[in-house]
């Protein structure tokens, strides 16, 4: 065996996780733009937009890793010395919005849906910095010639989730309720499983071409409208399949063991995530809702 063959064999012998290790954080410019960036920390990611007058950033993603928020700010500083004007919360869940103090210290105005403000105040968590400004249905942030449209699209993964669209760049940032090319899995635990379909349809009706999800998709790729449609089709199919099982009295345990969605078995997260999807829909159809 020559040295090259030996090296290949040794690499192949490594466990998958060792081959796929990646740095704990990464900042990437969105291809085809000169001002839109994705900051990834572990399994979470956020978007920030650089303009001639300042920066619009999203979700600090500091839950369990407060130092990473400082890193996020430092990564922005590597790109631009312009002030961070806004920090936008996608929704109120702490895994996405904990740790915003470094942004607040940098002078950012924190914007979110009004329900996010109410939820944050009710939780009284010192790591969740309260909002400065809120809105109910829609708001557009305009800074340095760039517009970011913030839209509340109803109940989905939470009751406070907004999506953020860059009309010029045709980019959408949507968190948790629109995973790219994968089974939602444990994210279904607190889904509004019927209402989320309406949210996705609203997003599909908007003008955009690329989707930045709040959790990296397979290969860290950005999503497309086809990905959004595929997710909607998956949820509808899962809902109808579990409804049929519920009518046969199979919810909960039997349905989790027996219900399969072979069309989606190649999606990442299928094996571990499908039982959680079934459980959530059993919570609807198995109770006669």
Question: What residue ranges belong to the model's regions?
Answer:
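Active-site HxH/HxHxD metal-binding segment of metal-dependent hydrolases
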Residues: 74-142
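Metallo-beta-lactamase
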Residues: 54-56, 60-64, 140, 147, ...
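Accessory terminal helices/loops
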Residues: 17-20, 205-207, 219-289
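Divalent metal-coordination and catalytic microenvironments
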Residues: 35, 49, 59, 91, ...
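Bacterial N-terminal signal peptides that target proteins for export
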Residues: 1-8
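Conserved beta-strand hairpin/beta-sheet module of binuclear metal-dependent hydrolase folds
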Residues: 28-76, 162-166, 170-176
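Solvent-exposed loop/turn segments at secondary-structure junctions
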Residues: 43-46, 55-56, 62-66, 92-97, ...
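Hydrophobic h-region of N-terminal signal peptides that target proteins for export
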Residues: 9-18
């Amino acid at each position: 065996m020559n040295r090259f063959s030996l090296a290949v064999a040794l690499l192949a012998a490594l466990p998958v996780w060792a081959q796929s290790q990646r740095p704990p954080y990464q900042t990437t410019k969105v291809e085809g733009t000169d001002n839109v960036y994705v900051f990834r920390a572990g399994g979470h990611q956020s978007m920030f937009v650089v303009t001639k007058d300042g920066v619009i950033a999203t979700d600090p993603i500091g839950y369990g890793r407060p130092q990473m928020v400082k890193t996020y700010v430092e990564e922005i500083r590597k790109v631009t010395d312009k002030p961070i004007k806004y920090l936008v919360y996608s929704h109120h869940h702490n895994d996405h919005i904990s740790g915003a103090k470094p942004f607040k210290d940098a002078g950012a105005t924190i914007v979110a849906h009004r329900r996010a403000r109410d939820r944050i105040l009710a939780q009284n968590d010192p790591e969740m910095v309260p909002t400065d400004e809120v809105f109910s249905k829609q708001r557009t942030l305009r800074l340095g010639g760039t517009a970011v449209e913030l839209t509340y699209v109803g109940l989905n993964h939470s009751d406070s989730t907004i999506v953020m669209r860059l009309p010029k760049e045709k980019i959408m940032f949507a968190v948790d309720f629109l995973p790219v090319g994968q089974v939602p899995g444990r994210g279904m635990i607190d889904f509004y499983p019927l209402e989320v379909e309406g949210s996705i349809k609203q997003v599909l009706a908007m003008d955009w071409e690329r989707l930045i999800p709040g959790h990296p998709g397979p290969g860290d790729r950005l999503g497309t409208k086809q990905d959004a449609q595929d997710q909607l089709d998956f949820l509808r199919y899962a809902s109808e399949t579990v409804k049929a099982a519920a009518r046969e009295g199979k919810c909960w345990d039997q349905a989790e063991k027996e219900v399969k969605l072979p069309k989606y078995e190649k999606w990442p997260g299928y094996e571990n995530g499908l039982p959680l999807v079934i459980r959530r829909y059993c919570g609807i159809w198995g109770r006669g809702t």
